[in-house]
């Protein structure tokens, strides 16, 4: 054997971060319906029952005795932060693995918008969270401050407005954007709609400020038609679909053994 190769290089692992791949994975976190056991769901109005139940009943129907935000910081939020960092670094932003996803300004803008959307629902469910000092472990800040919800809402509105102004409608993103297929107009509408949602909730405690923020977001133009809805499309392919096959198998056993059981558990 004359050329054994380099055993310290894994040919199956990328040598450079690809921002398109980082963004695709971050987008997968919008599909969940609630937050529990490392899943993110935007319907935070349903979650207080999970949080309060364990104070009264250790084992209840909700089955949510523990929870953590670690997966959201580790994956979608961190991925978006890395996209922002790569596209802001003069030595990185021009590399093929970066620019193939789209122009730098739009990458930063969509990453900030998606982060804002996720942060909004996390703080709505949990209140204080690390925001201003998040992602500073590289600077040896391992105990970030938990910002108040008031601070987070103010920062989210400001950061989302900055992101909105960064969008370049003459540019686009690649198909790595699995939510809007690179449509910058759609991302701008989601950005403005997220700010409107923040403002409506803020108005419950600060009507004047909520009204002011809403007016600005509304003027920017939010989602007004179904064509611009935030949708997560699942594949119809069920080949090798383990859980789907398991459901079919178990249901068939119920039908065979005792059909009335299906009515009871449905």
Question: Which residues does each predicted region cover?
Answer:
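Single conserved hydrophobic/aromatic residue that forms the stacking wall/gate
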Residues: 254-266
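Conserved, well-structured interaction surfaces
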Residues: 50-130, 136-175
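Carbohydrate-binding/catalytic loop surfaces
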Residues: 140, 177-185, 230-253
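Membrane-proximal, proline-rich intrinsically disordered regions
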Residues: 1-55, 63-64, 71, 89-92
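Internal, well-ordered domain-core segments that constitute the primary functional module
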Residues: 154-229
């Amino acid at each position: 054997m004359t050329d054994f190769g380099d055993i310290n290089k894994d040919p199956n692992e990328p040598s450079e971060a690809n921002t398109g791949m980082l963004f695709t994975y971050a987008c997968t976190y919008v599909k969940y319906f609630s937050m529990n056991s490392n899943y993110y769901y935007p319907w935070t109005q349903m979650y207080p029952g999970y949080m309060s139940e364990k104070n009264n009943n250790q084992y209840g129907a909700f089955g949510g005795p523990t929870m953590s935000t670690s997966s959201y910081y580790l994956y979608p939020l961190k991925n978006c932060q890395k996209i922002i960092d790569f596209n802001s670094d003069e030595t990185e932003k021009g590399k093929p693995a970066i620019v193939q996803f789209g122009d730098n300004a739009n990458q930063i803008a969509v990453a900030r918008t998606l982060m804002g959307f996720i942060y909004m629902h996390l703080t709505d469910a949990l209140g204080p969270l690390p925001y201003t000092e998040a992602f500073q472990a590289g600077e040896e800040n391992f105990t970030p401050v938990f910002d108040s919800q008031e601070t987070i809402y103010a920062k989210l509105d400001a950061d989302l407005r900055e992101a909105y102004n960064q969008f370049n409608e003459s540019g686009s993103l690649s198909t790595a954007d699995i939510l809007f297929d690179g449509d910058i107009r759609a991302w701008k509408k989601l950005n403005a709609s997220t700010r409107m949602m923040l403002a409506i909730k803020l108005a419950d405690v600060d009507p004047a400020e909520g009204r002011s923020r809403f007016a600005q977001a509304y003027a920017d133009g939010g989602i007004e038609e179904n064509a611009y809805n935030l949708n997560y499309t699942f594949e119809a392919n069920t080949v090798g679909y383990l859980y789907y096959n398991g459901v079919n198998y178990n249901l068939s056993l119920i039908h065979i053994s005792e059909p009335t059981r299906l009515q009871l558990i449905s």
